[in-house]
UniProtKB/Swiss-Prot annotation:
It comes from Archaeoglobus fulgidus (strain ATCC 49558 / DSM 4304 / JCM 9628 / NBRC 100126 / VC-16). The gene is rps19e. Belongs to the eukaryotic ribosomal protein eS19 family. Keywords: Ribonucleoprotein, Ribosomal protein. Part of the 30S ribosomal subunit. This is Small ribosomal subunit protein eS19.
Length: 147
């Protein structure tokens, strides 16, 4: 059985986002916000919430136990400040927090004393998606079978 580590991250995130579209709805305010103070505009993709949700889910799987502040740092970026030199700024805490709440309501993530961790149900969900994705990739590229 393949795990999250065995498949490309971009393909896995897209596939998990498609699955999560049936399970959750983005908050009302999601269409009006930027993803952080370092951004000048809001996301152009209509389904950006599901992609961020899937990305956070994968991050918790890989890095867990992880907290909101560490995830904010991961999704941060360089803030342009005009003629002054750029500085790093963290990403939006509300987006990370609400995404984690949605994953907790689905039963995929739980809160512990050290931070958020993936539950066995969440690990099973991600591993099943990774296994399906890997079998499709092996049929396209037979050389991947040895991994």
């Amino acid at each position: 059985m393949a795990t999250v580590y065995d498949v490309p991250a971009d393909l896995l995130i897209k596939r998990v986002a498609e699955r999560l579209k049936d399970m959750v709805a983005p908050p009302e305010w999601a269409k009006y916000v930027k993803t952080g103070v370092h951004k000048e505009r809001s996301p152009e993709q209509d389904d950006w919430w599901y992609l961020r949700l899937a990305s956070i889910f994968r991050r918790v799987y890989i890095d867990g136990p992880v907290g909101i502040e560490r995830l904010r740092t991961f999704y941060g970026g360089r803030k342009r400040r005009g003629s002054k030199p750029p500085k790093f700024r963290k990403g939006s805490g509300a987006i990370v927090r609400n995404a984690l709440h949605q994953l907790e309501q689905l039963g995929f993530v739980k809160k512990t004393r050290e931070g958020r961790v993936v539950t066995p149900m969440g690990r099973s969900f991600l591993d099943k998606v990774a296994t399906e994705l890997k079998s499709e990739l092996v049929s396209e590229i037979p050389a991947l079978e040895k991994y």
